[in-house]
Amino acid sequence: MIKNGHTNEALSFTQKLTESIAVEMSAINTNHPVVNAVLNQKYRSMQEKHIAVILKVGDLQEICLEEEDIVILLSNLLDNAIRESEKVLKNTGKAVIHLKLECEDHKLIFAIRNPVTEKVEIENNTIKSKRGDHHGIGLLYVKAVVDKYGGDMVLSCDENEFKAVVIL
């Protein structure tokens, strides 16, 4: 277009392309830049791995967590869900992660459910590792964030699904 002297058309095309890329890069918007960055990065990772995700997110611009704590909370729980979902996907050809992240009654609710290949033993709200492979270490960091803000965390698992709910 530019070679043929169609600068305005080239500029318009470039602008539309840039807008399209920006929309793709920010598929999830919670009105909180750090939450958006983590969620969009994990969302792209799930898409690349062909893991389905069902999201329910709200406006989080008012949450008062330190940025580092947001990253610890979201990254650890989402990484665990993605890692286990990859295993399930290899075995069954299908994996769906359910994610809820909203403010309700002035509290942040973060709930995640993901499929599992086998039941994970949970004792005193921590994962009991059978293999000694540091399984569940990230959840200790999550628990530290939960404790720092005086919140609650509940973990549960059956033969098909792992659930984590954090309320801050």
Language model feature labels by segment:
Residues 90-106:
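Short beta-strand/loop element within the Bergerat-fold HATPase_c
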Residues 150-160:
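Glycine-rich ATP-binding loops of the HATPase_c
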Residues 67-91:
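Conserved ATP-binding N-box helix of the HATPase_c
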Residues 106-136:
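Glycine-rich/acidic phosphate-handling loop/turn and adjacent ATP-lid/helix
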Residues 27, 53-74, 130:
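Conserved short strand/loop->alpha-helix "switch" segment adjacent to the catalytic nucleotide/phosphoryl-transfer site
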Residues 138-142:
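Short alpha-helical Gxxx[C/S/T] motif in the catalytic ATP-binding
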Residues 15-19, 31-48:
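Short beta-to-alpha transition helix within the HATPase_c
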